[in-house]
């Protein structure tokens, strides 16, 4: 579906249009050789075992054809960085290899801005802070990540409090590095896991969260062609706003 109408084979998507894949809405903004995609919660970025259809890459291929970077191969065309299936929000897609290399280098040099918002369990002691702790595969469960010294990569997350609620905190996180599950692992490491996180979170939360509350809110980078700094922002999705409202009601009693 494009803007609520059935899509036709070969139909192109234009800036500001909304695309639906398996009922999930994707908003796409174009800036010449890069695309900013607002991914919905519950959508996998690229095909993998158990998720071959209904991915973001499937949608990009359908609407962009072969005009995507090929650096990451046929399974991840245009994908410069990823966000988890149950994380909503922004990611950048490269339309050619030149753009891909430029964006990847900015990520490597830590000049690529990525800001998230999350609801975490408990009340943070300080209004802001930094978690500087290496992340690697959990030796007891290879599907999970953990803070570990051996066979790990440096990882740095800056956080600040937006609003405090009874038993929970609404925070902003800024990534200095971009490791797998970084925010989820780091916040769990300091005792304040992302609410609704079924992997790293707490059991039996007071609020019935349906999946993790983590949204990629802002992305900023130097445009590969114009050399201008540009930013994209994404409004908090309805699911996130719903939980903030619940927390407001709980905290007011």
What residues fall within each predicted segment?
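RNA pseudouridine synthases
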Residues: 1-130, 134, 239-246
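Active-site flanking residues adjacent to catalytic metal/cofactor-binding acidic residues
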Residues: 37, 185, 196
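A structural signal for well-ordered alpha-helical scaffolds and beta->alpha junctions
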Residues: 53, 128, 152-155, 212
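The conserved catalytic core of RNA pseudouridine synthases
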Residues: 73-105, 113, 117, 136-190, ...
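Glycine-rich beta-alpha junction loops
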Residues: 122-124, 177, 204
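Short, surface-exposed loop/helix-turn segments at secondary-structure junctions
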Residues: 146, 196-208
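Post-Walker A helix-loop "phosphate-sensing" segment adjacent to the P-loop in P-loop NTPases
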Residues: 191-195
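Active-site-adjacent capping/gating segments
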Residues: 208-216
């Amino acid at each position: 579906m494009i803007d609520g109408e059935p899509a036709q084979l070969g139909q192109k998507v234009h800036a500001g249009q909304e695309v639906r894949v398996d009922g999930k809405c994707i908003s796409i903004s174009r800036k010449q050789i890069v695309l900013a995609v607002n991914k919905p919660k519950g959508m996998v970025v690229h095909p993998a075992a158990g998720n071959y259809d209904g991915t973001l890459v499937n949608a990009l291929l359908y609407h962009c054809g072969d005009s995507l970077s090929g650096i990451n191969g046929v399974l991840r065309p245009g994908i410069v960085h990823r966000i988890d299936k149950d994380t909503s929000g922004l990611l950048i897609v490269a339309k050619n290899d030149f753009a891909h290399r430029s964006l990847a280098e900015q990520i490597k040099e830590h000049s690529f801005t990525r800001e998230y918002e999350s609801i975490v369990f408990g009340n943070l002691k300080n209004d802001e802070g930094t978690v500087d702790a290496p992340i690697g595969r959990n030796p007891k469960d290879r599907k999970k990540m953990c803070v570990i010294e051996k066979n790990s990569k440096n990882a740095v997350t800056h956080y600040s409090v937006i609003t405090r609620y009874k038993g929970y905190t609404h925070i902003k996180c800024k990534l200095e590095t971009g490791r797998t599950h970084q925010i989820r692992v780091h916040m769990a490491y300091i005792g304040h896991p992302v609410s609704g996180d079924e992997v790293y979170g707490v059991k039996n939360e007071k609020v019935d969260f349906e999946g993790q509350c983590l949204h990629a809110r802002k992305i900023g980078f130097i445009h590969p062609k114009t050399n201008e700094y540009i930013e994209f922002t994404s409004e908090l999705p309805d699911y996130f706003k719903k939980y903030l409202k619940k927390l407001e009601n709980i905290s007011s009693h």
